[in-house]
Amino acid sequence: MAGFYDIISPSNQHRPPVWLLRQVGRYMPQYQELKTNRPLKELFLDTESIIEATLLGPSLLGVDAAIVFTDILSILEGFAIEYRFAPGPEIIYSPHQPFVFTEDPFSTFSFLIEAIQKLTKRLTVPLIAFAASPFTLASYLIEGGASKDCSKTIAFLYQYPDKFEALLNEIIKGTAIYLQLQVQAGASAVQLFESSSLRLPPSLFSKYVVSPNAKLIRLIKQRENPPVSLFCRCFYQEFLSLYATGADTLHPDYHVELSEIYRQLGDPGSIQGNFDPALLLLPQDLLIAHLETYLAPLKQQSHYIFNLGHGILPQTPLENVQAVVKCLTSISTS
């Protein structure tokens, strides 16, 4: 079974493979044109829009992988949970209401399955399916959308630990089915996003991040056994505990120094990340100088995948992103 790095890495290229978090988005004029006068949710649920947007990554940037154009909330279609973008995500949900995944996921997600089937026929690079990790999706549900402090979630898991555990378990089961469908349709690999984890105290990290992600990854791999990359917002000590999840590739955010990982661990396995997306706002000459400094200790490391420490910011110049990818695809490790 090929690992995440092996699937993403271009053949006969002695350089780090590259793709980017939120590589298709508001910073692209072509994407803005696609979404003109259309609700964002409509784009995520429309087969042809998914196809058109997904293709923008490889066609405009020249990255080594495409990632399915959808949202971490799209899975809520399978739980019959009402949500919208206004413009940010808003979820209509009470953590005390029933939360069970659909018995007919093929019908519920037919729009997505069809998009992936068509994309795999058109793409010349691998296609990555993705979903939120359990704690992150649970926090979105309890907070009613994105939250910087996850205060409602933290209070809920302390007050109702059994209910929170039950919610995580339903998320794990539903997410595994959701991702298996996409792999069966033709996706080559899976990316998980644990974006809310930075808010958890270290004493709860293992219980609510490591253990649930380990369960989810085991379930995802039961059928097609796709390689899985895990993005997680955390600090160094918490990052080390992520090896217990069984993820093929670990992707820390910019709070973790990759050079420190290699210095401490020697051979840490497949690592992805974690260039600060804020640097993409710099004048291009300064951006490339920072990029070259960042890459110096990394580009000769085996199984290293270049990516960002978080998603591309909406105000990022497209030409800066293109310059970063061009720099990556032209370097030599010899």
UniProtKB/Swiss-Prot annotation:
Q: Name the enzyme group at the top EC level.
A: lyase
Per the UniProt record, the site (Transition state stabilizer) maps to: 71
State any GO BP term from the record.
protoporphyrinogen IX biosynthetic process
A cellular component annotation (GO) from this entry:
cytosol
Kindly list the positions annotated as binding substrate. 22-26, 71, 140, 195, 310
Task: Tell me the compartments it is located in.
Answer: Cytoplasm
Q: Which InterPro entries match?
A: UROD/MetE-like_sf, Uroporphyrinogen_deCO2ase_HemE, Uroporphyrinogen_deCOase
EC number annotated for this UniProt entry? 4.1.1.37
Q: Which SUPFAM superfamilies match?
A: UROD/MetE-like
Family listed: Belongs to the uroporphyrinogen decarboxylase family.
UniProt-listed HAMAP family: URO_D
Q: How does it assemble?
A: Homodimer.
What protein does this entry describe? Uroporphyrinogen decarboxylase
Annotated source species: Chlamydia muridarum (strain MoPn / Nigg)
